């Protein structure tokens, strides 16, 4: 890549022809480690420019080698499993936040930047409607949909606004003022407790507890679980939008409305998050109060990088276990939204949460005549499919987050991908196969 004038002023090494330079991502962040030091030879020449003698000589020093946490085989499988879908998928180590794979689709060949790039090739990449230059796991911002419901459930437990024995009735509609807020199940779920509401992803249940909480408590809980954090390690990571009253006033100069709290309660509205945040949120839910920080550096010149937990005393471990039980039911209860993505292996039960995020407004007229199916909509109006998951349920090792743009409901689109990524992690890293249940 050609140097900018700004780069050329940073160090004399930036002006040496063919001297390697990191300009994006990890190579930019760790450029001072990787670059090394060029050798210097000072010589004397005569008036004709002929060599006379050497005055001084300093040997060059090699840069340091950096090993990433990425498992190349798992990385290749992750790309393969996304296939032709547009979106993101990643796998992290549940114990320490190490990123084992991170795939963005569509992708591009980075080697095109290692040589002179003609205008036609550049415009083809930069003007592509599917935006291959966006690193979706780190920079893609999406409504998290129902993958956000465990956050709302934990907030309700944290602030004592619900007990595990409490039940809320869902008839398919939640009236607020002069507007009806609908459940995805128009016939309703009946009476549900907290873990079953997570399992069946009941919107009405989460409308009710979101209204009890208010946006401030939801926002604060989300931030404690990692939403809105900025990780310096990942240059250019997008920061999620965790809205509250101040945020709306700052951005729209308008007061917050209760209906907006209901939308956030099901992961919609102004709320936006990145796939890496969804993975870290999952880790923070299942690690008994330990806060996980994402990491992609395994070692520098052979010296291992230890990515330690940070203790978080803001959540009751019993409350975290209740959320974990609800996520187990998502996959392993026959009424769970992820039931078709379960495994047969008791040593590798999967738990998780499916999500579907709307990108359009459904009119009252459409609800009356029948909501259009995704396949009958223009591609850009179809729902995003999401899934967060971990395995095994007991002593989790792997966490995945999957977002497939305009692929339809997460139960059918993203959950099978997430299941396969968790199974592949076990197979590739531990050499153990896992049987799935074919429904």
Over which residues does each language-model region extend?
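A generic structural motif
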Residues: 405-408
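Short hydrophobic alpha-helical segments used for membrane anchoring or interfacial signaling
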Residues: 89-94
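Hydrophobic face of alpha-helices
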Residues: 27, 75, 219, 320, ...
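Short, gly/Ser/Thr-rich active-site loops of penicillin-recognizing serine hydrolases
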Residues: 303-311, 416-439
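Generic non-transmembrane alpha-helical segments
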Residues: 77, 81, 155, 221, ...
């Amino acid at each position: 890549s050609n140097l900018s004038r700004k780069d050329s002023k940073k160090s004399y090494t930036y002006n040496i022809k063919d001297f390697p330079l990191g300009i994006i991502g990890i190579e930019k962040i760790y450029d001072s480690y990787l670059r090394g030091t060029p050798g210097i030879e000072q010589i004397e020449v005569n008036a004709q420019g002929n060599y006379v003698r050497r005055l001084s000589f300093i040997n060059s020093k090699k840069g340091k080698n950096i090993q990433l946490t990425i498992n190349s085989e798992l990385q290749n499988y992750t790309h393969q499993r996304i296939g032709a879908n547009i979106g993101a998928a990643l796998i992290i180590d549940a114990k320490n936040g190490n990123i084992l794979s991170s795939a963005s689709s569509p992708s591009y060949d980075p080697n095109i930047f290692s040589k002179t790039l003609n205008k036609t090739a550049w415009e083809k990449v930069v003007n592509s409607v599917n935006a291959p230059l966006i690193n979706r796991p780190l920079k893609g911002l999406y409504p998290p949909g129902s993958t956000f419901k465990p956050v709302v459930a934990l907030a309700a437990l944290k602030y004592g606004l619900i007990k595990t024995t409490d039940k809320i009735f869902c008839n398919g509609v939640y009236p607020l003022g002069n507007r009806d807020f609908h459940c995805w199940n128009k016939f309703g779920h009946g009476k549900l407790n907290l873990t079953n509401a997570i399992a069946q992803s009941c919107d009405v249940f989460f409308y009710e507890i979101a209204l009890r909480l208010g946006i401030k408590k939801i926002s604060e809980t989300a931030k404690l679980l990692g939403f809105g954090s900025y990780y310096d390690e990942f240059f250019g990571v997008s920061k999620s939008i965790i809205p509250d009253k101040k945020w709306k006033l700052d951005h729209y100069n308008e007061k917050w409305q209760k209906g907006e709290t209901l939308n956030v309660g099901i992961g919609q509205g102004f709320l936006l998050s990145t796939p890496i945040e969804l993975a870290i949120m999952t880790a923070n839910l299942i690690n008994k109060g330990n806060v996980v920080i994402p990491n992609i550096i395994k070692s520098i010149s052979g010296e291992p990088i230890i990515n330690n937990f940070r203790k978080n005393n803001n959540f009751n471990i019993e409350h975290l276990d209740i959320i974990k039980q609800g996520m187990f039911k998502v996959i392993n209860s026959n009424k769970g939204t992820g039931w078709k993505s379960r495994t047969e292996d008791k040593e590798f039960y999967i738990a998780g949460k499916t999500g579907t995020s709307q990108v359009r407004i459904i009119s009252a007229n459409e609800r009356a005549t029948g909501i259009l199916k995704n396949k009958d909509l223009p591609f850009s109006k179809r729902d995003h499919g999401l899934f967060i998951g971990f395995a095994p349920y007991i002593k989790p090792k792997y966490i995945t987050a999957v977002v497939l743009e305009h692929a339809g409901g997460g139960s059918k689109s993203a959950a099978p991908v997430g299941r396969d990524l968790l199974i592949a992690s076990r197979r590739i890293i531990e050499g153990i196969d896992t049987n799935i249940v074919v429904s």
